[in-house]
A protein has these predicted regions:
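Short boundary segments that mark the start of a structured unit
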Residues: 1-277
Length: 277
């Protein structure tokens, strides 16, 4: 295929004292005129005393992995000679590599759909199939995203195909999570990169609030600190007491002990509490 030209040799059984002419024309077989080769017609002249001549058919180079293909060259209407063998085969040998499949990562916010793209290094004349399967990482297969086990087809002549993985929305504030999609068992291709990450970006935020508290002297003030949603990890918040702006307010360190501390709300909880006495 990469040679660029196919050369046919026309041979006389013996030399002639006169010029010999013969018409020729290409014809399609499994190879396609205009795509795999350039169709050629013309008249070949073998001068008197000459016993051989050549006909050149241009071949088209491509990157498609395909079977070897054929066309024909046919001779007709000779002058000063007869035709012993009118047709010859043009065999175009494919020299393109078997396509290799790779896969790109898919990213989405939770509740969204992650799209994965499988790509070929070069096209094929045949459909290519490859199996894909999801698995857990920090995200749980079947919980944080829909488990998938399917077969993807990349159609003949194409170099990419896509598939989707649907993720599950929740209200938990958590770190971004990942799963894995793995390719296996290709047909008409090899695999160069069989694994891709599914990245699920968290879109939840835990909001913390605190309310005023009223207590009797010598009492203990408990301050609940509720969160709007659970978190995938411990939440810490620093609290500090201070004297109010009005002269009627209690004085930090006199009416109550000045307090500074750190409150930790455990993973999965929606509230914490700290006290001032």
């Amino acid at each position: 295929e990469s040679d660029g030209n196919a050369t046919f040799t026309v041979t006389l059984s013996e030399a002639s004292v006169e010029d010999v002419t013969v018409e020729y024309a290409t014809g399609s077989g499994t190879a396609t005129n205009g795509t795999d080769y350039t169709g050629t017609t013309g008249t070949l002249t073998l001068s008197a005393g000459v016993t051989t001549g050549t006909i050149v058919v241009p071949i088209t180079t491509d990157t498609t992995d395909e079977s070897d293909e054929t066309a024909t060259l046919t001779l007709s209407n000779p002058n000063n000679a007869t035709i012993g063998d009118a047709t010859s085969d043009l065999v175009i040998t494919d020299d393109d590599a078997t396509p290799a499949i790779s896969i790109s990562d898919g990213t989405t916010t939770e509740g969204g759909t992650a799209t994965f793209t499988a790509s070929l290094t070069n096209p094929s004349s045949e459909d290519i199939t490859v199996e894909y399967e999801s698995s857990s990482g920090t995200a749980t297969n079947g919980s944080d995203f829909n488990a998938v086990t399917e077969t993807l087809t990349i159609s003949a002549g194409e170099t990419t195909a896509t598939f989707d993985v649907v993720t599950t929305a929740d209200a938990k504030d958590e770190l971004d999570e990942t799963g894995t999609v793995t390719l296996s068992n290709p047909t008409n291709a090899t695999i160069s990169d069989n694994t891709a990450d599914l990245v699920i970006t968290d879109d939840d935020t835990a909001n913390i609030t605190i309310a005023n508290q009223t207590i009797a002297e010598d009492g203990i003030a408990s301050f609940p600190v509720p969160m709007s949603t659970t978190s995938g990890g411990p939440v810490t918040v620093v609290y500090t007491s201070s004297t109010g702006a009005s002269g009627d307010n209690a004085t930090d360190g006199a009416d109550y002990p000045g307090t500074t501390g750190t409150l930790t709300i455990p993973t999965g909880s929606t509230a914490g509490v700290f006290t001032i006495d």
